[in-house]
């Protein structure tokens, strides 16, 4: 299946449900869910161990409704939910655009950890050239709705930020 993380931190989660409830929905994506409260209690320790690894304060909020989380915490949770069951394709649609620079860097590092650990195929849409060069292994550059450059790993490795910016001149 396809999984995605949206640009808006408010998308991709159920705001009035808790972190644990959102994770339970993600864990059983595509399956019959039934007896929700019983399953929730069964998986709480697993969910706690999972969010402990994120390290952005989310670990203190397993029983907190999503609407009370920061944008960075919501995006980290959305990413975790999107990758809890290994997707065939992870679509990242400007998923750091609404975040402050420090939170954006932390989320990109978390994204890279998930992609590398689970060997995920990810399509990241971004306007951050530095992220495209650092994390992408293939870059497709578009301008005015047209592909103007398709760079493989080897070609990308030879580029600097200045080279990349010159593609848009």
Please tell me what each predicted stretch does.
Residues 50-67:
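Conserved ABC nucleotide-binding domain
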Residues 105-117:
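Helical segment within the ABC ATPase nucleotide-binding domain
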Residues 146-169:
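Conserved beta-strand-loop-alpha-helix hinge in the C-terminal portion
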Residues 126-127:
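H-loop/switch region of ABC-family ATPase nucleotide-binding domains
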Residues 101-103:
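Helix N-cap at the start of a conserved alpha-helix in ABC-type nucleotide-binding domains
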Residues 17-29:
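Q-loop/switch helix immediately C-terminal to the Walker
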Residues 90-93:
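Catalytic Walker B motif of ABC-type/P-loop ATPase nucleotide-binding domains
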Residues 82-83:
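ABC ATPase C-loop
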């Amino acid at each position: 299946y396809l999984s995605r993380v949206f640009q808006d931190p408010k998308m991709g989660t159920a705001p009035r449900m808790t972190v644990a409830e959102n994770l339970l929905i993600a864990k059983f994506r595509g399956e019959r869910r039934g007896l929700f409260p019983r399953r929730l209690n069964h998986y709480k320790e697993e969910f706690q161990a999972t969010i402990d690894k994120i390290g952005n304060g989310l670990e203190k909020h397993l029983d907190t409704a999503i609407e009370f989380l920061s944008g960075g915490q919501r995006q980290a949770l959305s990413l975790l939910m999107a990758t809890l069951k290994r997707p065939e394709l992870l679509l990242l649609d400007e998923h750091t655009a609404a975040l402050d620079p420090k939170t954006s860097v932390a989320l990109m590092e978390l994204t890279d950890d998930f992609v590398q650990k689970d060997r995920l195929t990810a399509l990241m849409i971004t306007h951050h050239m530095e992220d495209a060069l650092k994390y992408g292994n293939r870059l497709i550059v578009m301008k005015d709705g047209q592909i103007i450059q398709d760079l493989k790993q080897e070609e990308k490795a030879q580029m600097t930020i200045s080279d990349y910016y010159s593609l848009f001149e």
